[in-house]
């Protein structure tokens, strides 16, 4: 079997093209989408991620605002900045780059971001709304994975999907989105005793466990579609390179389609961050119009 390599870069380019069109429409209505990015400290990997996000925002026509805080800044200072951005009507999305320094409570900081501006989809209001099937801002990586799956498979109804990993960022929201698409969903994790056997039954496998090449061909059903979320840096004969959670070369002869690492899920995450920013801008503009109309009606 010759597997199809799912091109995340090409798919992301299509999503960003639609985002650009949406931004153009919003600007014609007097709405300029804006994304505020907060970086605490100077972690090299975070610097790269931030730079990539800002470049994509500029390409899409989204105004980006960069806020940098020193690594030793207090949690109170970070929360004060978030509160200021929450009330700034010119800012539609707030992105807090993770990880944060150890002395700052990550959960507190993420929860402080207004749900309407939470373009990462991590606020409890958005998490709860996702589980209820409401129209909320959803986490970017799972949303990107779903887009790739729908482009690759079409209708997902009735397919058996296994999600490997139960993180709040990928595993749990991924399972919720697959359920919304009418899949039968199994989540396996570090305490699962039959993870391999469950994966062998899956039409769709989403790997998000953070262990390099953990899943080989023996885990996979012939013809399965594999979305590899893992990004792991390994030493390969003295050279550093990125690999996924799936042994890519080993799986190629078994699966029908698979995402590469890099070039698979990563570009989709940033594309859906931009998409969420535009969605947030549109929703906020609608809410402000509705509020203004309500005020006018109350006057008359």
Swiss-Prot record:
One of its GO terms (molecular function) is methenyltetrahydrofolate cyclohydrolase activity. It comes from the Bacteria. Pathway: One-carbon metabolism; tetrahydrofolate interconversion. One of its GO terms (cellular component) is cytosol. The keyword Cytoplasm does not apply. Its EC number is 1.5.1.5, 3.5.4.9. Pfam families: THF_DHG_CYH (PF00763), THF_DHG_CYH_C (PF02882). InterPro entries: Aminoacid_DH-like_N_sf, NAD(P)-bd_dom_sf, THF_DH/CycHdrlase, THF_DH/CycHdrlase_cat_dom, THF_DH/CycHdrlase_CS, THF_DH/CycHdrlase_NAD-bd_dom. GO terms for biological process: L-histidine biosynthetic process; methionine biosynthetic process; purine nucleotide biosynthetic process; tetrahydrofolate interconversion. NADP(+) binds at residues 165-167, 190, 231. PANTHER family: C-1-TETRAHYDROFOLATE SYNTHASE, CYTOPLASMIC, C-1-TETRAHYDROFOLATE SYNTHASE, CYTOPLASMIC-RELATED. Catalyzes the oxidation of 5,10-methylenetetrahydrofolate to 5,10-methenyltetrahydrofolate and then the hydrolysis of 5,10-methenyltetrahydrofolate to 10-formyltetrahydrofolate. Homodimer. This is Bifunctional protein FolD 2. It comes from Pseudomonas syringae pv. tomato (strain ATCC BAA-871 / DC3000). The gene is folD2.
